[in-house]
Amino acid sequence: MRDDSGPPLEEDQARPPRALPPVPSAIQVCSSFVENNSRMDQQDDLVGEDDIPLSHPKKKKSRTKSSLATASSEGHAEPVVNRRAEGSEPPAAELKEHPEAPAPRRQKKIRPPPELETSLTERPSSPSLLRNENGIDAEPREEAVIPKPRRKAKKTQPAEPQYASELGVEDEDILTDEQSTLEHHSRFTAPTGVSQPVGKVFVEKSRRFQAADRSELIKTTENIDVSMDVKPSWTTRDVALSVHRAFRMVGLFSHGFLAGCAVWNTVVIYVLAGDQLSNVSNLLQQYKPLAYPFQSLLYLLLALSTVSAFDRTDFAKISVAIRNFLALEPTALASFLYFTALILSLSQQMTSDRIHLYEPSVNGSLWAAEAEEPILVPWIIVNLVVALLVGLSWLFLSYRPGMDLSEELMFFSDVDEHPETGTKASP
């Protein structure tokens, strides 16, 4: 209800136009379109019956439901309906005044081309005349909306790594074979094709990739592996172990050579002395040039053989060595026999010197008359015992030539501490 308490306005005095609220651009276009339709309806009423072609019946263009729904949702549907009703009043009055005249037909409105409709919808809202309650056209107060130009988003291309300066392209790097076109796969799916081996491979040399034949590359890698296997890195332990094994082989040779020399020495002595040592003077005269060289060689071989035999025995643990000797262990027995033979050979070294200096006419004090036999008999017996001891030692060591207890102690002590590994010392 309107408040009528205010002073009444005079009929002759026109009311000032009331300012309407700003209308959105879409609603404004819709209202202008409705106003144009109402004006065209008024013009159609004024046209005569003869001017309207009969072949074209009147068709009333209905508004789209979407425009009415949009107008009603924005709250401006009532003004549009009221304006439509006001615009339709004059034709009804004329029909009442002239009831006999036939109802005039309206002309078919020509639909503007799509270019104009597009320009009409895209054009910014122009100030249109709207009618207020008194029927006076008034311009709505609305700020012109300037459409903002849309900027097309440019796709950022990933920066390509600049490796052209570092990696050069050579003629041999370019493959002349026909290359099949690669199918475009999605980024996150693995290719389903099976890779085929290529005859050429690219190897980086001095910060550049060079083409090389696959077969030649495989040969070079195999040669490198073989050379690495042939020349392993040696440690101090490996050198000591190799020297120890080499000396063991030399000692084994000296054992056999010493046994042969001792037996030969004994045979020569008994042959030169005759039966029952009856010709001692002949022994002294014939054995004189052989005394020094042969006794020196015999002493050298005895020393090497004794050290080699001791090297095979574990003397770091005295109790273990004594137990092995009492158990008649071959290496322990050979060591004891060689040491005994060396002591006996040294005990008869003075007699060997006297044999070397045998001259009855010059050195009569060294060899007195009838004193030759008592001096030579012990020397002959000692040489016989040395030959027997050396021969037995050689037989004991020949029974087990690869046995070396000191090697197991010095180089394979970690194997003894962890017997569960099942590793044994190599001979």
Swiss-Prot record:
Family, per entry: Belongs to the TMEM237 family.
Composition-biased stretches (Basic and acidic residues): 75-87
Transmembrane regions: 252-272, 290-310, 325-345, 375-395
Pfam family, one: TMEM237
Name under which the protein is recorded: Transmembrane protein 237
Subcellular location as annotated: Membrane; Cell projection, Cilium
Gene Ontology terms: biological process: cilium assembly; regulation of Wnt signaling pathway
Bilayer topology: Multi-pass membrane protein
Main subcellular location of this protein, as a coarse class: membrane
Subunit structure comment from the entry: Part of the tectonic-like complex (also named B9 complex). Interacts with TMEM107.
Region annotated Disordered, chain positions: 1-172
InterPro entries on file: TMEM237
Function (record text): Component of the transition zone in primary cilia. Required for ciliogenesis.
Modified residues (Phosphoserine): S25, S72
UniProt keywords, alphabetically: Cell projection, Cilium, Cilium biogenesis/degradation, Membrane, Phosphoprotein, Transmembrane, Transmembrane helix
Organism of provenance: Mus musculus (Mouse)
PANTHER family per record: TRANSMEMBRANE PROTEIN 237
Intrachain disulfide bonds: none
Biased composition (Polar residues): 28-40, 118-131
GO cellular component labels: ciliary transition zone; cone photoreceptor outer segment; microtubule cytoskeleton; nuclear speck; photoreceptor connecting cilium; plasma membrane; rod photoreceptor outer segment
Top-rank lineage group of the source organism: Eukaryota
Comp. bias (Acidic residues): 43-52
